[in-house]
């Protein structure tokens, strides 16, 4: 039963340590979606547990314990839509672990995922309008993070080689909360380590205000977007 779904999963063994946590609010407003996320996490934990055990048994001298951490948070909600952000950190041998983010938009009524594309009259045009904003935002972040004398213009050109309107549309896209309650302030696009820059630079994300793309919103969704995006400090 959905009411019995745990809000936290944990595995502790000598060869594998895993955990998964879920925003409590999800179980209140979207228990069916929460149950789906829990089951997905359970399957991933069990699969990595099995992989770790198999590797340990096959090559115990070179084996290092595996780890997997999964976290889901509710980022924004408006009307029938909610936006979730996932974070996964994993280690399965090698010089370092890997991590990445996941963004999902769900319909509360259907409990199914909804793409940002489905909210837009002309997705390609909306992304083309948003791309310059994303490139400038990432370039500024890279300038602050990496520095080294490189200019924002240099980082912008490098980012443009890795990011296009097409890759954005097929990437990890979510919605963000707004300064105006009960609406979305924009969308966020996530980039995993290696997608932009070196692994050492880490992940990046850029938030595009709804004012940039609202002319491309379908009438059924336009009222759900207003204000300015609420961003992290």
Mark where each language-model region is.
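Compositionally biased intrinsically disordered regions enriched in Thr/Gly
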Residues: 1-233
